[in-house]
Amino acid sequence: MNSLDLPKAPQDTRVVVAMSGGVDSSVVAGLLRRQGYDVVGITLQLYDHGAATHRRGACCAGQDIHDARRAAETLGIPHYVLDYEDRFREAVIDRFAESYIHGETPIPCVECNRSIKFRDLLATALDLGADALATGHYVASRARPGGGRALYRALDPARDQSYFLYATTPEQLDVLRFPLGELPKDETRRLAREFGLAVADKPDSQDICFVPQGRYQDVIARLRPDAARPGEIVHLDGRTLGRHEGIIGFTVGQRRGLGLATGEPLYVVRLDPETARVVVGPREALATSVIRIAETNWLGDEPLADLDGMPVAVRVRSTREPRPAALRWNRALACAEVVLETPEDGVSPGQACAIYADDGPRARVLGGGTIQKVEAARREAA
């Protein structure tokens, strides 16, 4: 077996590397090239890069395509750019907008990985005769004794991206490889300098790639100009406190920017797209104890429906560590739920819920799903 767990010599193993133009994927290409693999770099053009050509900290736009091409030239590997704009708009951007209109808080990076990178790009890689598709994600995969591969949290907990990759299927894991899963970020940058890559000190991606300066409302207003529907801001106790210009300007857990002068700290507790109401309340009203998930992807060894009561750990935001919970199978709805050991604040429909075998730093990823509904830890008055 070679270093990618494939039964071929490196020089006989073709690996397509998804090159975003950042330091991580460029180092992956460099590592594999140094190990003697037949490396091909592919960069996806995902959106109209006119406004982003000179913007740093995004991915898959004009400057990033240039950086990826330059890295490939430095490493001496072939490089191709594929136009996936239409696919990306339909699968990711349009869905992102619709989710916000329906009062949800979507995680577009999960859908991009699921629908674009690990489905469409992977199919293209296989068409090119690739034995593996490698990415610069900080997550680990390992061969299982009985066959197949399992997904695990990365060595560097500060860089772990397993939350965004829970939707990776077993079939995709068989082909995907994540060489940075066992490296700390400072080692990645050291390798970039060793390889002579111009992106060695390029800043990491911060915002959602198609949302300039984090202003998602502008994206939604451009795509769905009729989406802004004025409505009331209502307290949990039934009081009407004010009005707003559209629920797309609010997210669950938000405190600032409510435009209320009540003398008490209030948070967005719920968004109701049917009535266009923004429901607010005290911080304790944000506590969630039960999460129902949909679009579930399960990577565990046993069927999910047979694991009612199984102790796990769950992550509802990328910036939070996994927290202890228990699986619950809702037989009436034929869907999974997780019961949190300690209530979480600010959990919103549309977010991702990643499930782990435990809350350890190298825990196995068991799958996850999109949060469909949450149950408050206390009874609400409205």
Curated annotation (Swiss-Prot):
Principal location: cytoplasm
Top-rank EC class of the record's enzyme: transferase
Domain of life, source organism: Bacteria
Subcellular location: Cytoplasm
Site feature location: Interaction with tRNA: H137, Q351
Record's keyword annotation contains ATP-binding: yes
Reaction(s) this enzyme catalyzes, per UniProt: S-sulfanyl-L-cysteinyl-[protein] + uridine(34) in tRNA + AH2 + ATP = 2-thiouridine(34) in tRNA + L-cysteinyl-[protein] + A + AMP + diphosphate + H(+)
Disulfide bonds, paired cysteine numbers: C112-C209
Keywords: ATP-binding, Cytoplasm, Disulfide bond, Nucleotide-binding, RNA-binding, Transferase, tRNA processing, tRNA-binding
InterPro entries per the UniProt record, alphabetical: MnmA-like, MnmA-like_C, MnmA-like_central, MnmA-like_central_sf, Rossmann-like_a/b/a_fold
SUPFAM superfamilies: Adenine nucleotide alpha hydrolases-like (SSF52402)
Coiled-coil regions, chain positions: none
Binding site for ATP: A18, M19, S20, G21, G22, V23, D24, S25, L44, G136
Residues at the catalytic site: C112, C209
GO cellular component: cytoplasm
Ranges where the record places region Interaction with tRNA: 159-161
Entry's Gene Ontology BP terms: tRNA wobble position uridine thiolation
One term of GO molecular function: ATP binding
Its EC number(s): 2.8.1.13
PANTHER family: MITOCHONDRIAL TRNA-SPECIFIC 2-THIOURIDYLASE 1, TRNA 5-METHYLAMINOMETHYL-2-THIOURIDYLATE -METHYLTRANSFERASE
Membership in a protein family: Belongs to the MnmA/TRMU family.
Role: Catalyzes the 2-thiolation of uridine at the wobble position (U34) of tRNA, leading to the formation of s(2)U34.
Descriptive protein name: tRNA-specific 2-thiouridylase MnmA
